């Protein structure tokens, strides 16, 4: 075995050990280091990609009297600003809309209902329909705060109304989720989504404070 090959094998072994250690060692959030590095890179890249779309986000949000930073936060949570994404449940594009919600939004805007490929690849239309859908959630349930709107955007208005009715109110449903979390049980993914989106919204507010 020549020296170059021995060096290569040693490097491969070292890399394998580093990856293994990366999965065994956890960060302060309890994530394996390897996973933390990948996730943090994806998040920061998403902030940059969504930020590059700020002019379009600002104009689309303005049409629906929405906070553009909130819309940017949703885009970050849904697609990380990457075009052409399809979720496991069939949600499409930058704002991750299902066809039924997109068709309803298009009807409210006086537009033709988009087909699958149009909704997936027409970023401007996807953004406009996503903003209209968010505005519809806001207007149809005015008592909801930003967190509740985001939960509904993620899981569906009907489902959140059902959860709130079962708990007695939205606030009581949130309280029940926090009790679960305190007891070491998983919190609703939709509530986690909403709270992370609000944190990202705040980051965009700081970044584009002058707009």
Name these PLM-found stretches.
Residues 1-7:
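Short, Lys/Arg-rich N-terminal segment immediately upstream of the first membrane anchor
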Residues 9-25:
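Hydrophobic membrane-insertion alpha-helices, especially the h-region
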Residues 28-83, 106-109, 124-125, 200, ...:
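Export/targeting segments at the very N-terminus of extracytoplasmic proteins
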Residues 36, 149-211:
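Catalytic and substrate-binding regions of cell-wall glycan-acting enzymes that process beta-1,4-linked
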């Amino acid at each position: 075995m020549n020296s170059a090959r021995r060096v290569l094998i040693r490097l491969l072994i070292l890399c394998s050990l580093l990856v293994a250690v990366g999965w065994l060692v956890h960060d302060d959030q309890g994530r394996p280091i390897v996973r933390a590095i990948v996730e943090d890179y994806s998040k920061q890249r998403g902030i940059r990609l969504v930020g590059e779309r700020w002019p379009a986000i600002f104009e689309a949000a303005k049409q629906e009297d929405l906070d553009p930073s909130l819309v940017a936060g949703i885009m970050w949570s849904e697609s990380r600003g990457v075009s052409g994404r399809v979720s496991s449940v069939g949600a499409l594009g930058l704002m991750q809309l299902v066809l039924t919600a997109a068709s309803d939004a298009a009807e409210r805007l006086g537009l033709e209902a988009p087909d699958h490929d149009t909704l997936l690849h027409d970023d401007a239309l996807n953004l406009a329909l996503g903003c209209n859908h968010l505005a519809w959630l806001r207007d149809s349930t005015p008592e909801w705060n930003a967190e509740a709107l985001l939960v509904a955007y993620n899981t569906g208005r009907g489902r959140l109304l059902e959860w709130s009715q079962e708990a007695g109110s939205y606030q009581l449903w949130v309280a029940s989720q926090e009790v679960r979390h305190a007891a070491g049980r998983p919190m609703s993914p939709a509530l986690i989504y909403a709270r992370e989106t609000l944190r990202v919204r705040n980051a965009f507010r700081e970044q584009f404070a002058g707009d």
